[in-house]
């Protein structure tokens, strides 16, 4: 039998709602924190056994239904020739931001077996270590989000330089997006060949675009990636309530909802012919359990036992989250939904 999450993503009947958490592999876990005291994130990625260990830790501690392959969305662009540093409390910093078509044409479209063999080895290690009912989720960044980092040179909230490039130099923008989307498609296909059961596209900042600009400048490139895979796909962004229908049209067996969009409304808008993932506010886990429980029950009630729901947070686990609360949340969802499935 296929992993629970894979069956849910295909909207098949499941014995309970699958649960995993974005950013579950990392900053809240003691094992990961100990490793990061001596190694940078990219250093962890380049050590397959260590990368696999970090990926598996939350599955063992929380009992979640999926491992998400530990990596960073900027990892594939290193193989393109980009000098990127992950700066603590800042994020990705690019030494030479993309400013011209000449800069774009310097970027290679690498073969993953040559640029990230360590990640592919780690994928195989994790898949072999997981129980058959547990899924392995691989991921890549959305082309818009990563292009924004490459053009801005560092994280931003307004994406002024990025939009200026889109509007003033569309030929530069589209050539950059072509190279990114092809690189990312090769990257996630290689992860699937190595053992990933599903792929999530994280377009974290695409909500900065208007609907019209999303459809012109971003959606075709996400569609290229999501449409090029043989395994279930999850399409996720934050602040994207105004884009949901267009994101669904761009692809994804499952559409990830952030915490701002009521689940029932979001599912209605993307269509019940696909699944949804989400969408508890991550900040609730910093507060009293009673509120977590009530909000979780409301989400499950909104899902209504309909095939295709994957329970997750509406964004990544926050750094100050108590790991024990994640296990408790997973247990709550399993308990509630197993009872519903058993009653059918």
Question: What do the predicted segments below correspond to?
Answer:
Residues 1-88, 125, 223-224, 323-344:
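N-terminal basic, low-complexity leaders that serve as flexible interaction/assembly modules and, when applicable
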Residues 12-44, 73, 78-88, 96-100, ...:
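N-terminal small/glycine-rich loop or linker at the start of catalytic domains
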Residues 39-40, 108-110, 229, 248-250:
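N-terminal start-of-chain detector that recognizes signal peptides
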Residues 42-46, 107-116, 282-286:
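The substrate-binding groove and active-site-proximal loops of carbohydrate-active enzymes
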Residues 89-128:
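A gly/proline- and charged-residue-enriched helix-loop-helix capping module
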Residues 115-344:
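Active-site loop segments of alpha/beta catalytic cores
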């Amino acid at each position: 039998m296929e992993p629970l999450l894979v069956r849910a993503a295909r909207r098949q009947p499941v014995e309970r709602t699958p649960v995993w958490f974005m950013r579950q592999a990392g900053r809240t876990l003691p094992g990961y924190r100990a490793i990061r005291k001596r190694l940078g994130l990219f250093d962890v990625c380049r050590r397959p056994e260590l990368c696999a260990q970090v990926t598996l830790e939350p599955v063992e501690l929380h009992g979640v239904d999926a491992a998400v392959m530990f990596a960073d969305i900027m990892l594939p662009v290193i193989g393109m020739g980009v000098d990127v540093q992950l700066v603590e409390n800042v994020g990705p910093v690019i030494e030479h931001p993309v400013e011209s078509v000449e800069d774009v044409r310097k970027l290679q479209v690498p073969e993953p077996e040559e640029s990230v063999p360590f990640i592919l080895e780690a994928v195989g290690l994790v898949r072999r270590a997981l129980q058959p009912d547990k899924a392995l989720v691989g991921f890549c960044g959305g082309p818009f989000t990563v292009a924004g980092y490459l053009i801005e040179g560092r994280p931003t909230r307004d994406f002024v330089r990025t939009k200026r490039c889109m509007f003033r130099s569309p030929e530069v923008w589209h050539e950059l997006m072509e190279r990114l989307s092809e690189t990312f498609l090769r990257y996630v296909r290689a992860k699937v060949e190595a053992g990933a059961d599903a792929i999530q596209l994280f377009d974290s900042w695409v909500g900065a675009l208007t609907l019209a600009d999303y459809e012109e400048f971003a959606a075709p490139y996400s569609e290229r990636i999501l449409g090029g895979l043989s395994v279930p796909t999850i399409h996720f962004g934050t602040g994207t309530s105004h884009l949901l229908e267009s994101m669904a049209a761009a692809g994804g067996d499952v559409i990830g909802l952030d915490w701002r969009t009521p689940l029932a409304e979001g599912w209605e808008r993307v269509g019940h012919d696909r699944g949804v993932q989400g969408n508890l506010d991550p900040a609730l886990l910093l507060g009293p359990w009673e509120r977590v429980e009530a909000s979780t029950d409301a989400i499950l009630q909104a899902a209504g036992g309909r095939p295709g729901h994957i329970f997750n947070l509406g964004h990544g686990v926050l750094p100050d989250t108590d790991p024990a609360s994640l296990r408790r949340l997973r247990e709550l969802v399993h308990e509630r939904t197993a009872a519903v499935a058993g009653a059918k």
